[in-house]
Design a protein with these regions (language model features):
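Intrinsic, short, N-terminal disordered tails of RNA polymerase sigma-factor systems
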Residues: 1-8
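Sigma70-family region 2
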Residues: 11-12, 48-66, 84-86
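Short, charged helix-capping/linker segments at alpha-helix termini
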Residues: 11-20, 30-49
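Residue-level preference for hydrophobic side chains embedded in well-ordered alpha helices
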Residues: 21, 25, 29, 50, ...
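Arg/Lys-rich amphipathic alpha helix in sigma70-family domain 2
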Residues: 75-88
């Protein structure tokens, strides 16, 4: 599915938006998180938090390019989790 259509699904508040995002970019998000965290469970949690972050952010914005916007959310979440783990 095209990114514009996925963004449209987020604007419509359709749960299909998350499924389409996961289908198209889920592996990319996991790789971003796992390269930082090196822990499958924490990486999966970051990916799920990315979907929540997108769900909350998109009605206010129409990001372009979508993959970079979403990937940055994943990166920020993974870095935050890494800092938290390192501080403990």
């Amino acid at each position: 599915m095209e990114d514009e259509k996925i963004i449209g699904l987020y604007w419509e508040r359709s749960e299909d938006a998350i499924a389409e995002t996961a289908s198209k970019y889920g592996r990319l998000f996991f790789r971003i998180a796992d390269n930082i965290l090196s822990d499958q469970e924490d990486s999966e949690e970051c990916v799920n938090d990315t979907y929540l972050g997108l769900w909350n952010a998109i009605p206010d914005a129409r990001p372009s390019p979508f993959a970079a916007f979403a990937g940055r959310i994943t990166l920020n979440l993974a870095l935050k989790k890494y800092e938290y783990r390192s501080a403990a």
